[in-house]
């Protein structure tokens, strides 16, 4: 029962002045990627905050931006599946992000903030094929940068197929040269619309899936572009900086999953990535120079709340964590909610949960049609 409290009116308010200087965060850009949103946040948003849109819209993104700030993050890669409207479909979305001081990024397959899943109309725009429709593709990318340049963004330099597919219509022996051309063209678009030196405009290159092979076959990446290493979709980072890459001016980062939709199998309903595994991988990445950009694929947000908190707390202060205390992090948070008297019970539940989930992810146990069907 909520107690009614009598309002007391005062004519003066005194606030104690305390000098406080915040520490510098361990990682410069720290944020989340909303992904595979069709089963959770999209229908929820359409029935609650953004009823008039029936979609994820500015009212929902305001709550997401507030959440990111409360967790000491500063960056968002928005939802981009066909089940939701593209972030830039609703002009108010970027105004909301800007009002919260949130830096907008995008996934590995969205060049220059363009979501080709729902914003590319094949009937009007033609094939998403850079070999045959370069002019049409760059026309859309040019328009997107023109519209979004006034805001703070991190631009993905990329060319893949539609959504999470590989390059279309490109012979393997021409892939490196084509991506090299793409990089030059997209940087040209940035130079055209942003009144800053190109090496001061935040850009990322994510060698995800087949792109890692293209990168390792001799792709020449400009020194100022951040090199963002992906994991294998199951929590193990596939590649770390070598000696030469550690000295790159653009620095490096990590794209990490605690939720995944794709081959060989999805895991969406439960976050079973152990904190110790996440710490081991992110600490290795940090120690080898991946400390400029950390992006967490958090799926629908709700199932991954604890993992998201651990990830962003590490991004804020990685040195607070070690192998002796990492398993206490989520326990301490839950104890702060439910009370110290439940600490042993919470420890037992969390240890058993991650032990069982690490042995075999529950989402991988079924052989019936996947959630996508």
PLM-predicted stretches and their roles:
Residues 276-346:
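Substrate-binding cleft of secreted/luminal carbohydrate-active enzymes
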Residues 2-6, 10-131, 149, 205-207, ...:
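Feature activates predominantly on carbohydrate-active enzymes
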Residues 329-368, 372:
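Catalytic domains of carbohydrate-active enzymes that cleave complex glycans
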Residues 1-5, 9, 366-373:
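Single conserved hydrophobic/aromatic residue that forms the stacking wall/gate
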Residues 11-15, 88, 98, 128-249:
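Gly/Pro-rich turn-and-neighbor structural signature
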Residues 54, 83, 127-131, 172-176, ...:
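Hydrophobic alpha-helical scaffolding
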Residues 43-45, 167-170, 217, 238-240, ...:
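Short conserved micro-motifs at the rims of enzyme active sites and ligand-binding pockets
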Residues 64-67, 71, 93-96, 100-103, ...:
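Generic, well-ordered alpha-helical scaffold segments in large soluble proteins
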């Amino acid at each position: 029962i909520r107690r009614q409290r009598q309002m007391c009116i005062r004519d003066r308010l005194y606030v104690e002045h305390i000098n406080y200087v915040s520490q510098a965060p361990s990682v410069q850009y720290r944020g989340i990627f909303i992904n595979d949103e069709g089963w959770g946040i999209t229908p929820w948003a359409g029935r609650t905050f953004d009823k008039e849109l029936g979609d994820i819209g500015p009212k929902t993104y305001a709550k997401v931006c507030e959440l990111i700030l409360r967790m000491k993050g500063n960056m968002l890669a928005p939802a981009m599946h066909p089940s939701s409207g593209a972030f830039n479909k609703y002009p108010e979305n970027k105004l909301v992000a800007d009002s919260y001081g949130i830096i907008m990024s995008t996934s590995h397959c969205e060049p220059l903030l363009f979501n080709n899943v729902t914003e590319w109309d094949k009937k009007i725009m033609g094939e998403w094929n850079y070999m045959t429709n370069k002019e049409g593709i760059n026309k859309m990318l040019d328009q997107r940068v023109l519209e979004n340049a006034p805001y703070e963004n991190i631009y993905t330099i990329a060319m893949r197929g539609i959504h999470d597919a590989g390059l279309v219509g490109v012979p393997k022996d021409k892939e490196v040269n084509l991506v090299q051309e793409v990089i030059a063209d997209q940087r040209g678009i940035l130079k055209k619309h942003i009144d800053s030196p190109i090496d001061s405009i935040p850009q990322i290159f994510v060698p995800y899936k087949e792109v890692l092979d293209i990168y390792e076959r001799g792709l020449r990446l400009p020194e100022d572009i951040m090199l963002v290493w992906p994991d294998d979709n199951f929590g193990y980072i596939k590649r770390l900086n070598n000696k030469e890459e550690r000295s790159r001016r653009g620095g490096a980062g990590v794209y990490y999953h605690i939720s995944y939709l794709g081959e060989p199998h999805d895991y969406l309903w439960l976050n079973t990535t152990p904190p110790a595994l996440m710490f081991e991988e992110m600490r290795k990445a940090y120690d080898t120079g991946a400390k400029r950009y950390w992006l967490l694929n958090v799926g629908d947000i709700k199932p991954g709340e604890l993992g998201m908190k651990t990830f962003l707390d590490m991004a804020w202060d990685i040195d607070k964590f070690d192998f002796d205390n990492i398993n206490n992090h989520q326990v301490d948070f839950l104890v702060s909610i439910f009370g110290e008297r439940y600490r042993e019970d919470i420890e037992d539940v969390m240890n058993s949960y991650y032990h069982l989930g690490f042995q075999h992810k529950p989402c991988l146990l079924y052989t019936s049609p996947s959630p996508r069907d």
